[in-house]
């Protein structure tokens, strides 16, 4: 019961924070920031879906090294094991799409910096194209899932007779595959972060001392990505707990509750990278309307008169 309450609180907080951030991006962003607001909207949308699936399944992941079992405790249990397995796959898939979009947003930042602003349609199109492989992969596993397969439940792992248990070859290999993919994608996020951070710092040096507005905007953006680089750390921590359980270094009676909970902190913390380090959104929240409008005007002037450097005036909020 306590575990379900914790999952409910985390899911509600995740949905609420990201819905609020999406509202700010859609309704409170200046027109010069439209591409950036689209990038934020897509990111927060995947975070909302991740949080919703976490509530729907409220899963525990158990392994003794020979098999992987998923124990759902959420509303999906009223719909049957197939619905719970679908929810389990969707949650892991949305987590992966979230990481992939972070990498893509770094690439878009570079594109905005040195080429031009992408259109909203192109951003949405890219987001859809990037999600297709993950959903095809997920659909393949779901189509092969058999809820009637016999499950061997290991002893002394804290599973009770009343628990719904998802297991079998498909559950084991699908969960293992997606967790490995999350780990690899998180590493790619760190590599992309190092690349775009060096790019932004190099660009700031090239600007010179006479373009302070642009350099300030770049500084804000670096702060955003410095905060966001900690988001994959929750994925790493969850994977490490799973590996400890898989190798029997950690007692599964406790660690089975940790993996999904740790994963949930990534979508919960994500909106704070914009709220804390993007002055425009922070001023809106604090009610400093005049300050917010003044900063937007300054950014607009920078955008119109600094040529290539002006592209960065669109980038302070271009963060996944």
Swiss-Prot record:
Top-level taxon of the source organism: Eukaryota
GO BP, sorted A to Z: short-term memory
Compartments (UniProt record): Membrane
Alphabetic keyword roster: Membrane, Transmembrane, Transmembrane helix
Transmembrane stretches, start-end: 5-25, 38-58, 83-103, 122-142, 176-196, 230-250, 258-278
GO cellular component, one term: membrane
Protein name as annotated: Serpentine receptor class delta-28
Species the sequence originates in: Caenorhabditis elegans
Protein family: Belongs to the nematode receptor-like protein srd family.
Keyword Membrane in record: yes
Pfam families recorded: 7TM_GPCR_Srd (PF10317)
Entry membrane topology: Multi-pass membrane protein
């Amino acid at each position: 019961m306590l575990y379900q309450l914790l999952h409910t609180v985390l899911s509600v907080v995740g949905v609420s924070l990201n819905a609020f951030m999406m509202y700010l991006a859609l309704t409170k962003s200046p027109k010069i920031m439209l591409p950036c607001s689209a990038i934020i909207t897509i990111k927060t949308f995947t975070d909302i879906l991740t949080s919703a699936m976490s509530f729907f399944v409220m899963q525990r992941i158990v392994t003794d090294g020979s098999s992987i079992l998923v124990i759902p405790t959420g509303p999906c249990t009223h719909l049957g094991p197939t619905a719970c397995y679908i929810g389990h796959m969707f949650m892991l898939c949305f987590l992966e799409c979230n990481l992939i979009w972070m990498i893509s947003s770094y690439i878009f930042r570079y594109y905005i910096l040195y080429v031009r602003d992408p259109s909203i349609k192109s951003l949405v199109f890219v987001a859809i194209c990037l999600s297709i492989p993950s959903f095809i992969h997920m659909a393949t596993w779901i189509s092969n899932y058999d809820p009637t397969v016999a499950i061997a439940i290991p002893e002394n792992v804290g599973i009770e007779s009343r628990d719904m248990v998802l297991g079998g070859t498909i559950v084991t290999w699908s969960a293992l595959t997606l967790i490995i993919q999350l780990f690899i994608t998180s590493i790619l996020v760190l590599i992309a972060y190092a690349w775009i951070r060096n790019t932004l710092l190099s660009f700031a040096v090239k600007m010179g001392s006479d373009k302070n507005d642009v350099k300030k905007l770049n500084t804000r953006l670096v702060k955003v990505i410095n905060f966001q680089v900690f988001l994959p750390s929750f994925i790493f921590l969850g994977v490490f707990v799973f590996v400890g359980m898989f190798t029997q270094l950690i007692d599964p009676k406790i660690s089975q509750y940790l993996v999904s909970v740790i994963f949930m902190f990534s979508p919960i913390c994500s909106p704070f990278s914009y709220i804390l380090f993007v002055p425009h959104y922070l001023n809106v929240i604090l009610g400093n309307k005049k300050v917010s409008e003044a900063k937007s005007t300054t950014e607009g002037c920078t955008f119109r008169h600094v040529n290539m450097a002006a592209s960065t005036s669109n980038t302070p909020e271009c963060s996944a």
